[in-house]
Amino acid sequence: KWAQEKGITGGIGNGLFGPNQPCTRAQIVTFLWRAAGSPEPKAMSSFADVSTDAYYAKAVAWAVENGITTGTGDGKFSPDATCTRAQSVTFLFRAIGKLVDSKAEFSDVLTDSYYANAVAWAVENGVTNGIGDGLFGPDNSCTRAQIVTFLFRAYQGK
């Protein structure tokens, strides 16, 4: 409900949200862009797989301009690829996070992994506490419910 009221997502159609559906890279950057107020990007991105008329085109351009993503290589963004929990928290961290002194205490988050600082920030700021049993689940698909929960917790009071 919060995400709908803030204009972050309108669901998947027919009055449905699809909470257990995996979230795509296009959806996540769009959610982040909308949470930031849908700022106009300076220029559109040059990814071969992002059409300028795609619903997520401005969001992708904004995400690139703000250092949230650089794509998946080979001039592509891979908008339809499912985002992992590690990627999702990293995108959110790059959008609004700040480095923290603590380390994430999950057995599946190595201190030298690209997402270690993002996970530490997310834990310290109450964005996530993992999936249980001392695990974060970095390679698990991030569901629509999870990313909206992460956003809600990160943007509380904003």
How would you label these PLM feature ranges?
Residues 5, 9-58, 65-86, 92-118, ...:
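Feature responds to low-complexity, polar/acidic, surface-exposed segments characteristic
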